[in-house]
Amino acid sequence: METSILSGLEASKALYSSLESRISHLKDRGIVPGLAAVLVGNNPASEIYVKNKTKKFESLGLKTDVFRLEESVSEDKLLSLISKLNTDSEFHGILVQLPLPKHIDSEKVLNAIIPTKDVDGFHPENAGLLSIGKPRFV
């Protein structure tokens, strides 16, 4: 078997070209895809990651909102926000930036995101689809 080097830049360009076309078709139908990014606390690495994601989304003409919560937010309040975002038609995807504070059950929070809005693919349904070669988003 021959080894080859994958060009991340070339793969990225091809992916974004495909995305631009798909986004254009959605916008023609009056749909502007939206991402809700949830950031708890002020972890510098998480801040950079979310900033880069939202910048890329915005460059594609997509709607992005970052929901910033204090490090001390209760799990119930975070779950309430997830529940609200699950039913908000402006957002087609939800990203909860990890790590979460120790007093919050990350698994419980990630499982609260409805599978069709789980952009990270952490929900058991999405992980299962990926494991059988039928990924929802990847």
Feature map (PLM): residue ranges:
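Positively charged, low-complexity intrinsically disordered leader regions
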Residues: 1-29
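Glycine-rich phosphate/diphosphate-binding loop of Rossmann-like nucleotide-binding domains
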Residues: 40-55, 133-138
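Short, well-structured alpha-helical segments in soluble
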Residues: 77-89
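Anion-binding alpha/beta catalytic cores of soluble intermediary-metabolism enzymes, centered on
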Residues: 95-138
